[in-house]
Amino acid sequence: MICIPVIDKDVSDAINSAKEALKYGDIVEFRIDLLNDVNFKDIEEFSKIPSIITIRAEWEGGAWRKSNEERIELLKNAIKNNAKFIDIELKEEKNLELVKYRNEIGSTTKIIVSYHDFEKTPEIDELIDVVEKELKIGDIAKFATFAHSKEDTLKILNLMNRYSGKIIAIGMGESGKLTRILGLDFGSILTFASMGGKASAPGQVDVKKLKEILKLIN
């Protein structure tokens, strides 16, 4: 799957961007933390669209500055409305609470548990530990680390291959672009691509360019 981040600040703009993005990608990621304002009704509307609902905490590189209680309740609302995916951080103490809630109400939402390092790509043993912890909590493990070298890129591709079909792995930055291009072939369930110059992380490839490259290599 190709996932296109939606990073608008207005709810109606985000809905329109998502509809346009789905002409090129398979799914969108709604970055709820970047919106000026959001309520339960908005989450219900977002959940109708094939998407990942992400409300990234400020302490994990996001922009959510309101209470964590409100953040968790909004994510529960996404689960209640059977959003395709939600994303919750590995470091979030209430991640298991969301999984328990999903199971109790019989929601079809898949839970992505994520980890970010915006400075470096840790050693492979540390990344394995992260992925194992994430898979004990949710359905899909995700990590995004900053790649500084070919060695970092190879580490990330190695992990994709090892956990094929249950991982999303990303190398941020110029050196990590190869992870975005080859990710699907190495076992990542999706790769992120930007549209119209709107990227949510460094190194995202434009969706049209990515599709051209994927067509050439496949």
Swiss-Prot record:
As one GO molecular function, the record gives: 3-dehydroquinate dehydratase activity
Checking CDD domains in the record gives: DHQase_I (cd00502)
* Binding-site residues, 3-dehydroquinate: 29-31, 56, 180, 200, 204
Q: Identify which residues the record assigns to the active site.
A: 116 (proton donor/acceptor), 142 (schiff-base intermediate with substrate)
**Per UniProt, which keywords does this protein have?**
Amino-acid biosynthesis, Aromatic amino acid biosynthesis, Lyase, Schiff base
* Catalyzed reactions per annotation: 3-dehydroquinate = 3-dehydroshikimate + H2O
Pfam families in the record, alphabetically? DHquinase_I
Superkingdom of this protein's organism? Archaea
**Some GO term, biological process aspect, for this entry: which one?**
aromatic amino acid family biosynthetic process
Knockout phenotype, as recorded, reads:
Deletion mutant is auxotrophic for all three aromatic amino acids (AroAAs) and lacks 3-dehydroquinate dehydratase activity.
Q: What is its EC number?
A: 4.2.1.10
Pathway(s): Metabolic intermediate biosynthesis; chorismate biosynthesis; chorismate from D-erythrose 4-phosphate and phosphoenolpyruvate: step 3/7
Give the family per the record: Belongs to the type-I 3-dehydroquinase family.
- Alphabetical list of HAMAP family matching this protein: AroD (MF_00214)
Subunit architecture: Homodimer.
Q: In UniProt terms, what function does this protein have?
A: Involved in the third step of the chorismate pathway, which leads to the biosynthesis of aromatic amino acids. Catalyzes the cis-dehydration of 3-dehydroquinate (DHQ) and introduces the first double bond of the aromatic ring to yield 3-dehydroshikimate.
Q: What is this protein called?
A: 3-dehydroquinate dehydratase
